[in-house]
From Swiss-Prot:
Span list, region G5: 174-176
Renumbered residue ranges of the record's region G2: 60-64
Keywords: Cytoplasm, Elongation factor, GTP-binding, Hydrolase, Magnesium, Metal-binding, Nucleotide-binding, Protein biosynthesis
Region annotation (G1) ranges: 19-26
Chain sites annotated for binding Mg(2+): T26
Region annotated G4, chain positions: 136-139
Protein name: Elongation factor Tu
Source species: Vesicomyosocius okutanii subsp. Calyptogena okutanii (strain HA)
One Gene Ontology cellular component: cytoplasm
Family membership noted in the UniProt record: Belongs to the TRAFAC class translation factor GTPase superfamily. Classic translation factor GTPase family. EF-Tu/EF-1A subfamily.
GO molecular function, one term: GTP binding
Amino acid sequence: MSKEKFERTKPHVNVGTIGHVDHGKTTLTAAITKVMAEVRGGEFKDYADIDNAPEERERGITISTAHVEYESEIRHYAHVDCPGHADYIKNMITGAAQMDGAIIVIAATDGPMAQTREHILLSKQVGVPYIVVYMNKADMVDDEELVELVEMEIRELLDEYDFPGDDTPVIFGSALKALEGDISDIGVPSILKLVDALDSYIPTPKRDTDKSFIMPIEDVFSISGRGTVVTGRIEAGVVNIGDELEIVGIKDTKTTTCTGVEMFRKLLSSGEAGDNVGVLLRGTKREEVERGQVLSKPGSIKPHAKFEAEIYILSKDEGGRHTPFFNNYRPQFYFRTTDVTGACQLPDGIEMVMPGDNVKMRVELLSPIAMEDGLRFAIREGGRTVGAGVVSKVTD
């Protein structure tokens, strides 16, 4: 039995392990659950549990992900670990597992490798804000100078992708020794040090209700004598009766006022993140609003049509395309609640994109959508999902 009841009072932070294949991500994940279960209660997950991660489907894409949880003195952590390299890429691009911070695992015996670099770049592109380093397999290196070299190399690599290399915590240890209960510095204490680094280096994320109000519009009705009602699920923030709001995307931005909030046929004085509501708008005609626009706090989000994106294209086995696509491919981009056609520009030197590939590209939409960096979307052809992506940079 676990020693203490799970408390919902601690702030919740999402993290995950990233890094090159066989550098010890899954062993480290198991070691953290074991050490923290002994210190704080909770459940120990062994290597096999994590490695046999069930397949999940996110936007039609098959991803194997293991979810574990543990508590530190001040926080509750939800931690994701993926068995395969492709799973990481899919996970990060679809946002199936949003990370407030990542633990990059690097074998001291190898130093940073190709996938280490790719995961750091992807973290930057998809907006993982903080990275902590665990230098693993410390039990297999005797050469102090080699360790310092690897540490220097990883800090430089982080700098290269605009992470603060000099300030990043680097913890030196052996996940395997920690899992075996070894109490020398590189064993259990290295895990405690790592969790301390997560606590102190990754800030507590802003709660959704503290962010600016935004609600993607799913449907529009007019109620005679009362005006226009838009319905949807509030993505972030809070809306109160009397608030001035903007309707953003597709058409020119319009200003309106909230005169009522309804949920399950009951009138509320306000609605907050996560609520499915109807918002009554004053002075707005039904034909001025459509699905795919968003209702937002004035000035908080702007419409854009051009952006750079990091994209994953489904493989044939995932129900995606059977053939590659080329420059100027024009699928539909599904943002929040609607499809908008856009043209794709491939990077120099890339002639085509095969099913199962991930690629960075520039996109220009036919009509603008309320958008900011980090927004996720699906790529569709005639209602069938053929890819997923994330806006890495708005360019207009």
